[in-house]
From Swiss-Prot:
InterPro entries: Restrct_endonuc-II-like (IPR011335), tRNA_endonuc-like_dom_sf (IPR011856), UPF0102_YraN-like (IPR003509). Pfam families: UPF0102. GO terms for molecular function: nucleic acid binding. It comes from Shewanella sediminis (strain HAW-EB3). Belongs to the UPF0102 family. PANTHER family: UPF0102 PROTEIN YRAN. This is UPF0102 protein Ssed_4252.
């Protein structure tokens, strides 16, 4: 049985990211990049909506027990994602509005929270 705090496999994580990316593409967002890694944090998906840059954290749970994916985001993860996004924008000379979205995938059900944090 998977505990809510137990890490999920990379394979399941990729499946969740694929579902999230396809969902966001269907909503009209533009895909830029995925799995951007820095030593201090990772960005699951980088998307755009017009001129707005969107940094997406994807949380996946195969079962919705223990509060589900939507409750799996910690304050430490938020801090690391914000730092990674800031670094990404500096490296790519991006001077634009950005936001942070959360995609929660629970047992195949997708919940999108724009401006989640």
């Amino acid at each position: 049985m998977m505990d809510n705090n137990e890490p999920i496999s990379a394979e399941h994580g990729q499946a969740g990211e694929n579902l999230a990316m396809n969902y966001l593409l269907e909503q009209g967002l533009t895909f830029i990049e995925r799995n951007v890694r820095f030593k201090f944090g990772e960005i699951d998906l980088v998307m755009k909506n017009g001129k707005e840059w969107i940094f997406v954290e994807v949380k996946y749970r195969s079962k919705s027990q223990y509060g589900g994916a939507i409750n799996a985001l910690s304050s430490g993860q938020i801090k690391r994602l914000r730092r990674a996004a800031e670094h990404y924008m500096q490296l790519n000379n991006i001077d634009a509005i950005c936001r942070f979205d959360l995609i929660a995938v629970d047992a195949g059900q997708i919940q999108w929270l724009p401006n989640a944090f």
